From Swiss-Prot:
Protein name: 1-(5-phosphoribosyl)-5-[(5-phosphoribosylamino)methylideneamino] imidazole-4-carboxamide isomerase
Reaction(s) catalysed by this chain's protein: 1-(5-phospho-beta-D-ribosyl)-5-[(5-phospho-beta-D-ribosylamino)methylideneamino]imidazole-4-carboxamide = 5-[(5-phospho-1-deoxy-D-ribulos-1-ylimino)methylamino]-1-(5-phospho-beta-D-ribosyl)imidazole-4-carboxamide
EC number: 5.3.1.16
HAMAP family (alphabetical): HisA (MF_01014)
One Gene Ontology term of the molecular function aspect: 1-(5-phosphoribosyl)-5-[(5-phosphoribosylamino)methylideneamino]imidazole-4-carboxamide isomerase activity
Swiss-Prot/TrEMBL keywords: Amino-acid biosynthesis, Cytoplasm, Histidine biosynthesis, Isomerase
Family under the similarity heading: Belongs to the HisA/HisF family.
Naturally occurring in which organism (per UniProt): Acaryochloris marina (strain MBIC 11017)
Pathway: Amino-acid biosynthesis; L-histidine biosynthesis; L-histidine from 5-phospho-alpha-D-ribose 1-diphosphate: step 4/9
Amino acid sequence: MDVIPAIDLLEGRCVRLYQGDYDQSQVFSENPVEVAKAWEAQGAQWLHLVDLDGAKTGQPVNLDTIAAVVEALEIPVQVGGGLRDRNRVTQLLNLGVRRGILGTVAIENPDLVQELCQEFPDQIVVGIDAREGRVATRGWLETSEILAVDLAKRMVTAGAAAIIYTDIQRDGTLQGPNIPMLREMAEAITIPVIASGGVSSITDLLNLLALEAIGVTGAIVGKALYTEDIALSEALRAVGPGRWQDVPPDLGSSALA
């Protein structure tokens, strides 16, 4: 299973939000490029970048920083935040970004998502961010009545390469991922699901690993890496390619609820 470190960009700095609240941001570094290089050095196979300013304004804002990160790394980078039209997606991919993550536009213009998936096969991922199972949009500032699983099914039809599912109420909280929701989504669709939000420990990753067989192929980890609750190198040894353990993960009530 992929363990993907996350860098959230706000005003050019590396930050973490609490439950998606821009007023509860914590700065972890003034130099996102150095942070990205550190994750690569520790064995990351992907990097997840979110332009929080872009998510809020509707167009990418931290382009210079994104370009610098992509140029500094050898591993592929996926980027989300403010990608709501073809020009913005093309602009990012031309910078060398491997995958663009579409969010709000999946609700507001699903036809465009389908067109982009056809134009850029395997490079378009849909990020579904949800509160209590319902999709949030526009930088998590608005919540729709659309169910996350229903949107995921539509995006499979559109041609998305994968779904990144973020449970907003767990994001930045270190409370553990929403295992039941991830299981429901993975069982409902035929493309990979990447978990995001709440991962706080190796145990959480092992519980996600139990879902790998049904399609949960990766976990995006943010705050727990910055607080050192998780060491990336240890996480990769535990659940990544060539993992050291073949012991079944904890399948207690938290995993099977």
